[in-house]
Regions:
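Interhelical loop/hinge segments that connect adjacent transmembrane helices in multipass membrane
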Residues: 1-13, 200-207, 216-263, 314-317, ...
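Signature of the first transmembrane helix
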Residues: 12-77, 81, 250-277, 428
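Interfacial transmembrane-helix starts/ends
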Residues: 14, 51, 87-113, 245-246, ...
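Transmembrane helix-bundle signature of multi-pass secondary active exporters and lipid flippases
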Residues: 53-65, 255, 259, 265, ...
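Helix-loop junctions and terminal segments of transmembrane helices
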Residues: 65-93, 289, 293-314, 387
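Interfacial segments at transmembrane-helix termini and the short loops linking adjacent helices
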Residues: 127-148, 276-280, 317, 343-373
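Hydrophobic alpha-helical transmembrane segments
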Residues: 143-148, 176-227, 403, 417-441
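Membrane-interface junctions at transmembrane-helix termini in multi-pass inner-membrane proteins
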Residues: 153-179, 201, 366, 370-397
Length: 451
């Protein structure tokens, strides 16, 4: 066995994780290039707009309503009773295939409405907010860029249930490979837009790359599969959305809506109340930390569908074995990433490199990294429990959202980024890890004992 194979075995890198990590590594490579373009091609005020675009586009969670995640979980439980054929179809118990067809049709209808509502609600909301931050002498070039960003985001939202459904049906590696190509084309389109003087249009260009890749892949690679599933619809055998899906979905919805206040509120507050450039420094620093966290979350994220299948088969010992092994592997990678980031930032500050002034200082950065380390544990526990088609973290998410939103507003308005970072760290340390882990251990014992 070669050294490379030993390393991938120790780190638990299967095909799905490999594609996912490649995509995240490409994102990690492309992120510095994108940040360089942001600094080089945009004014300081435009940088605030650029990063706040991203925060406001996260309002899509109010229209996604967690349906894609629920679709993935329910698809994985039904697919556990079916098998893939050589020509890319699902075969087996007709009842479970009919339930899959019902799930897909319902998700399609829901997202047609959600994408439309997103466009017509988020577009004017952004206009209202950015006009309040617009300087009198500043050109309004951001308006068309914002409209384009909202349109592309809405179209991506429309396709998201199809991708979640396919992933839930066991094609985790295929979706991971798709994400890799999306990251690649999105970054290239963004850079070209910067280079050609597109300025803020680079923001929608990134998501346009995602849209093009997903639309082409679905049309040329998965069209027949989706049609075959829909052809199995049987009104006598269908998923009863209100009785089966809704009890999980509304809890996921509340948790995901809470996520906006947990992760996205701070940049608009900093842009509104702090000096020009503060929001962009927070945005750049959190972009880097989020990229590292997302790489490490790949280990656990690719296990959502397999976890659902193991639970459907009542293979709880194997479920726990894979979960705890995967958690250790993802933590090891994140610790290495955090150490590397701190070392690089300290070096930039020591050398008085101009780029260091575009990032937060060492203290707030280390606090945000500590928060990310605690967040990876909470994320893993959430993946595990939600794979049971349950959402026990809903009320914790609501409390976290209230406390985080309060910190973001008060500290963001009066104390700046260091106050925000300290508040986030203390909240995760004294509330997040303890409360979420308590619920995780309690529910894990109860659910498996009942089975």
């Amino acid at each position: 066995m070669t050294w490379g194979r030993k390393a991938t075995g120790v780190l638990g890198i299967d095909r799905a994780i490999a594609f996912t990590v490649l995509g995240r590594c490409w994102a990690a490579f492309s992120l510095p290039v994108t940040l360089f373009c942001v600094v080089h091609f945009l004014s300081v005020k435009e940088q605030d707009f650029y990063f706040t675009f991203d925060s406001l586009l996260a309002l899509q969670v109010f229209f996604d309503l967690g349906i894609a995640f629920v679709v993935l979980q329910f698809a994985s439980h039904e697919r556990a009773h079916l098998e893939w054929t050589a020509d890319g179809r699902l075969t087996g118990d007709p009842r479970h295939k009919a339930r899959l067809a019902s799930l897909l049709a319902s998700a399609n209808r829901a997202y047609s409405w959600s994408a439309t509502l997103l466009f017509f609600c988020v577009l004017p909301a952004g206009f209202f907010f950015f006009r309040s931050c617009e300087e009198a002498a500043q050109p309004a070039a951001w308006r068309w860029a914002w409209a384009s960003a909202v349109l592309v985001t809405a179209l991506n939202l429309r396709l998201s249930p199809l991708l979640a459904f396919i992933e839930g049906c066991g094609r985790v590696a295929d979706i991971a490979r798709l994400r890799l190509f999306q990251q690649f084309l999105g970054a290239l389109l963004s850079w070209v837009t910067f280079a050609w003087g597109g300025r803020l249009f680079a923001a929608p260009a990134l998501n346009l790359g995602f849209l093009i890749v997903a639309a082409l892949w679905l049309w040329f690679s998965k069209r027949r599969f989706l049609r075959d599933v829909l052809a199995a619809r049987d009104n006598a055998v269908r998923i009863r959305w209100r009785q089966e899906v809704w009890p999980l979905q509304w809890r996921i919805t509340v948790s995901w809506l809470s996520g906006f206040f947990i992760f996205r509120l701070v940049n608009p507050v900093l842009m509104k109340y702090q000096p020009t450039g503060t929001a962009s420094r927070m945005g750049m620093t959190t972009k880097i930390i989020d990229a590292m966290s997302t790489v490490c979350a790949s280990w656990m994220g690719t296990k959502a569908a397999p976890f659902g299948a193991l639970i459907a088969r009542r293979q709880f010992a194997e479920l726990d074995r894979v979960f705890f092994r995967t958690l250790k592997q993802s933590y090891a990678v994140l610790l290495l990433g955090c150490a590397a980031f701190v070392a690089i930032l300290a070096g930039l500050i020591h050398l008085h490199h101009p780029f260091s002034s575009r990032l937060l200082g060492l203290l707030p950065t280390c606090l945000l990294l500590g928060n990310a380390l605690m967040g990876i544990l909470v994320n893993a526990e959430a993946v595990y429990l939600r794979s049971h088609k349950q959402e026990p973290f809903m009320w914790l998410s609501v409390v976290s959202a209230f406390l985080t939103g309060t910190i973001a507003y008060v500290a963001g308005r009066y104390l700046g980024p260091t106050g925000v970072a300290l508040g986030y760290f203390l909240l995760s340390l004294f509330f997040g890890v303890g409360a979420y882990t308590y619920v995780f251990r309690k529910k894990r014992r109860a659910w498996h004992a009942a089975a």
